[in-house]
Amino acid sequence: MSAFALVVASCFFFSCADLNVESNSSAESIRKQELALLAATGGYVLSEDVMKDSLLSFLTASDTESRSVISANSYEFTLADETTVSYPEVRLERSIAPESINSLSLYLYEFSNKDNESSGFAITSTDERIGSVLAVVPEGNLEDGENDFLAFYTECLENYIEETVDLWNEIDDEYIRAVCKEARVTVNSERSGTAQETILYENGEWTYKYGNNSRVLRTAWGQSDTYVSEIKYNTAIKAVYKKAYLTGCATTAIAQILAYYKPPMIMYPVCLEALNRKWDKTSGWDGTYNWQIMTENPSIAYLSESGQVQVAALMYEIAERLGAKYGTNGTSAKHSRYGSLFSSLGFANDGLSSYSYNKVKNSIDKYGPLLARGASKKTNHYIKIFGKKTKVSTSYSGGHAWVIDEYANLSCINKKSGEVIEASKDFVHCNVGWQGNCDGYYLSGVFDMNSGGYVKDSSIGRDAANVEDFYQYEVRIVPDIHFNGVYEPVNFGVAYEADEDE
């Protein structure tokens, strides 16, 4: 697999949430409306220079306090790979923008910043129907890119492009004119010799419009640790169960959210007693978490021993209270306990709900980071009625959990005789819980299970049908997490006895 084939898996495709020509529109109809307005521009192909300018605008504007101030002149870009995705040609019965999407070129850029000596990579495109900037990992190495999170994006990339192709081919002249009318864009088209309508606008550049990077996590925790340090994220779990079980993605995500808020917290007595019996490192510690020493460095490897011990102890406690099912290749947790766990620690939250960009944006603006999860397995449940099998429900399991802690928006202004068409793409910043690897900005639309952001059952058989590494089903979030000091009594305890025969 080429570097691009691997990393293209990490891209998210666009959401057009700023377009509002229909009230209460679904995400899919909003995307379709934006494609109709884009058809009215008469042009959809950007030059590579314009595409790189969009990427540069994103990189310089989305800087956070955790990074040094970034200058546009500090970046150097290298085209690492490119690929073209082809689709069957479709004859469209419309005079406005009659071309179907036959092929799309995607580009993988590596970049470095000489001022802060950081390096990262990005997925881009020169086709505005897909988007100029698709994913940005500000600090990351392609060689470190092989993890489960990328496998999910590979499938989403294929299917999201297919969804875009279908939507583009579906719109007709009448729909384009209607959308333009609602957007208060007049359609005074010219007729060429081939009777093709041309509604030409001056295409603008994609630039960073707004975002909120004030809630970014200051931790880059993981499920074990690749460093040489004696105490790793899963050391306390290993001390209790005598096997190198991973902490689990939900455990790591929730631990990082707690480290962001730094609530007053004492280890749950049952967990502290169990840990004291098995691990001498906690001897003399009263179970009170000292967030200052736990977060002095983003990585556990560079903390003091006391800080390392408390981070490892926190991972053990959360895993236990989530009812973790431990494993050396992966540790799962009961997602039904997410909300109650936060409540028991004095945090109000809205529990698991369906993903939407507006929920993410509002939650970050009002409170801070939120939890996201995607399921990897779908199980249909049936009953027999008069000998005939009938589906009665569907359940989801497996997958991955991560933190969303920022959002950002890119916009493009297209003009014609004073009229303006504005296109918009929304991004969310994900801390995926692998020690900073692949933390970055991804297009929000891929998470929306109501529109394109899913792996179709008809296609997942290629690679991902009910495979644990893929979490294409039922992406949900726990929004509005915030400390209110109201501790709801929940009877947790050591929740799962590890299976020694796994």
For the regions a language model picked out, list residue spans one by one:
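A recurrent domain-boundary module in secreted/ectodomain proteins
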Residues: 434-502
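Catalytic Cys-His active-site segments of thiol-dependent hydrolases/isopeptidases
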Residues: 125-141, 405-406, 410-444
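Active-site-adjacent substructure of cysteine-protease-like catalytic cores
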Residues: 94-118, 348-426
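Acidic/polar, low-complexity intrinsically disordered N-terminal segments immediately downstream
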Residues: 1, 18-115, 130, 135-234, ...
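C-terminal motif of bacterial Sec signal peptides marking the signal peptidase cleavage site
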Residues: 12-15
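Sec-dependent N-terminal signal peptides
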Residues: 1-8
